[in-house]
């Protein structure tokens, strides 16, 4: 699952997997604070995660409980990296969340292949980096940082974090 937030924790964008997993339409998610998808008893962990992000520019392997629209919860593992504008001002983060209840060997194999393909594609794009406009460079930099973080994670170990 993927989402992008601004510097104060408001969701700017998300993928369909994030919306479907939480039981919302995408339009119901955009513009809402991230705390709306976390049960109150997990707000402390989410706040700690935000604090670490503010201090370091990234969060890795942060276990957070997420809450669906129907009230059911699931354990997730959160990874986030900062996004900056062309003047290096913080504008938000790209965040990937793994649903720990879905970490089967088959799912892990799919993720490993996806990460490998993404790394190859980013490597191809990097050859033309100097030709990109500032907005595209910012997008590329954010994606590159995210995939560097994700590929440094041993996703096979995710099964054992439940």
Predicted regions and their residues:
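PAS/PAS-like sensory domain cap-loop motif
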Residues: 18-29, 87
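PAS-family sensory/regulatory domains
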Residues: 16, 28-41
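PAS-family sensory domains
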Residues: 89-100
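Conserved hydrophobic beta-strand signature of PAS-family and PAS-like sensory domains
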Residues: 11-12
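Core hydrophobic beta-sheet residues of small sensory/regulatory alpha/beta domains
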Residues: 2-5
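PAS-associated C-terminal cap
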Residues: 98-109
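PAS/PAC sensory module
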Residues: 61-65, 70-79, 84, 94
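Terminal output helix/cap of sensory domains in signal transduction proteins
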Residues: 41-72
């Amino acid at each position: 699952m993927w989402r992008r937030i601004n510097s104060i924790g408001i969701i700017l964008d998300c993928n369909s997997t994030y919306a479907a997993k939480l039981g919302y339409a995408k339009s119901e998610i955009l513009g809402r604070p991230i705390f709306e998808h976390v049960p109150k008893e997990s707000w402390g962990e989410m706040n700690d995660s935000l604090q670490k992000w503010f201090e370091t520019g990234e969060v890795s392997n942060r276990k957070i409980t997420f809450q669906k629209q129907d009230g059911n919860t699931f354990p997730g593992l959160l990874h986030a990296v900062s996004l900056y504008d062309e003047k290096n001002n913080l504008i938000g983060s790209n965040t990937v969340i793994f649903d720990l209840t879905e970490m089967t060997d088959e799912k892990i194999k799919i993720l490993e292949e996806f990460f490998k393909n993404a790394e190859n594609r980013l490597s191809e794009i990097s050859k033309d980096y100097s030709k990109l406009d500032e907005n595209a460079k910012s997008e590329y930099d954010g994606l590159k940082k995210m995939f560097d973080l994700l590929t440094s994670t041993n996703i096979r170990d995710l099964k054992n974090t439940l």
